[in-house]
Amino acid sequence: MAVYEAVIGLEVHVQLATASKLFCSCPTTFGQPPNSNVCEVCSGMPGSLPVPNGQAIHFATLVGLATGCTINPRSIFARKNYFYPDLPAGYQISQFELPICEHGHLDIEVDGVCKRVGITRIHMENDAGKNIHAQGENISYVDLNRAGTPLVEIVSDPDMRSAAEAVAYLKDLYAIVTYLGVCDGNMEEGSFRCDANVSLRPVGAKEFGTRTELKNLNSFRNVQRAIECEMARQQDLLDDGEKVVQETRLYDAVKNITASMRSKEEAHDYRYFPDPDILPIEISDSDMERWKAELPELPKARAARFVEMTGLPAAEVEVLVQSRGLADFFESAAGLSDARKAANFMLGPLLRECNSRGVNAADPAAWNMKPEALAELVRIVDQGLISSKIANDIFGDLFETGVMPERYVKEKGLVQISDSSALEEAVDAVIAANPAEVEAYRGGKTKLISFFVGQIMRATKGKANPALVNELLAKKLS
């Protein structure tokens, strides 16, 4: 039986976070009443003329710069001709022979192994509308609110060899476009979705096998499962001596199967030609330099710097850079306190509070707690004003109210007892109340020290300085 390897390429559709559509002034707001964000241009009325959105061109260029692409100073819009009810003009405005960006790459890591995935091209295009199939009715409706929304399609080289590599590539790309602020990243609303081209070939073969395209995968989990499912389907066909048919397939997440949708089109089927209504897009040298200067530090570079700052494992630091807002929050707090301790508070109690309260961990701007408050919490623990246990106990209140920690602990009477004479009284009382445990401790059961510490902490309502308690106990029990 032959051993096969997968050949996978992704076509990722990124909805650009512009206020208006690609060729008209209609808003791109999601969730509006059907056909309310529509005009003559995006509804494909004869005689209407498209005007390119400058912000979309800017955003597309930023994506190209962030992925190491060559930016073409001159690019051309083309008409992609096909019929579908949600495509009112009978063609999609896309780019073909001369896209805005070409020849980029993304470096991914899977199981500690780094790999470079090439990016063939990035081109701009307008989105189609949406067909709504009424349940129980023999009728379909068309909502054109989405028609004309600006997209960039990021086409990878067929360099991935497993579903895990495809997901790693997709997650890295997602991090980049959300860091850049060019996409809101809402996969449920279709802002970031992909098509996967999957084929199998014998290991060591140079030629590609027959590929199938899996359409409109809108979650990382579904991408992983759909590719694995399709690989298994093709493997079964080839093992049985059958041929894989080139076609477009849909993934059914409930049944975990892929089903045939239609035969796969080639580029010539769309009869591309330059759009006669739109002049070539030209990017000036001054615009290019200005946009290059706008590029933020990207997630991988920032993660590497945070590892150096904190000494934490890369896997933990990756959580801190999962969104630009979260990374900015950490950077602000770390600049005012011990970076590693600030990171530990964020990775522990802070994310715990986000999860328990259903708060978006990627959007610190919506939190009541500010970076200055987290930094102050780190500092007052370091100064001995409160113990780390108290800090963890009060974190929920601090997160909810946004009050500064030092003020909070003083108002609540939670300041740590670090006066040895005051603590000595509590230590003596606990020793006097537990003679059997004292005798056992002195007889060699030294683990009982934690029992004594616990009793003292209970007596002082958690306010005793643990280090000083241990020191006093060691002296009095010896």
UniProtKB/Swiss-Prot annotation:
* One Gene Ontology MF term: ATP binding
For this protein, the Enzyme Commission number is 6.3.5.-
- Reading the lineage from the top rank, the first entry is Bacteria
What is the residue range of the signal peptide feature?
Answer: none
Q: Which GO terms describe its biological process?
A: glutaminyl-tRNAGln biosynthesis via transamidation; translation
Catalytically driven reaction(s):
L-glutamyl-tRNA(Gln) + L-glutamine + ATP + H2O = L-glutaminyl-tRNA(Gln) + L-glutamate + ADP + phosphate + H(+); L-aspartyl-tRNA(Asn) + L-glutamine + ATP + H2O = L-asparaginyl-tRNA(Asn) + L-glutamate + ADP + phosphate + 2 H(+)
Keywords for the protein's UniProt record, in alphabetical order: ATP-binding, Ligase, Nucleotide-binding, Protein biosynthesis
Could you confirm whether the keyword Protein biosynthesis appears in this record?
yes
UniProt similarity note: Belongs to the GatB/GatE family. GatB subfamily.
On assembly, the entry states: Heterotrimer of A, B and C subunits.
Cited function: Allows the formation of correctly charged Asn-tRNA(Asn) or Gln-tRNA(Gln) through the transamidation of misacylated Asp-tRNA(Asn) or Glu-tRNA(Gln) in organisms which lack either or both of asparaginyl-tRNA or glutaminyl-tRNA synthetases. The reaction takes place in the presence of glutamine and ATP through an activated phospho-Asp-tRNA(Asn) or phospho-Glu-tRNA(Gln).
UniProt name for this protein: Aspartyl/glutamyl-tRNA(Asn/Gln) amidotransferase subunit B
Which species is this UniProt entry from? Desulfovibrio desulfuricans (strain ATCC 27774 / DSM 6949 / MB)
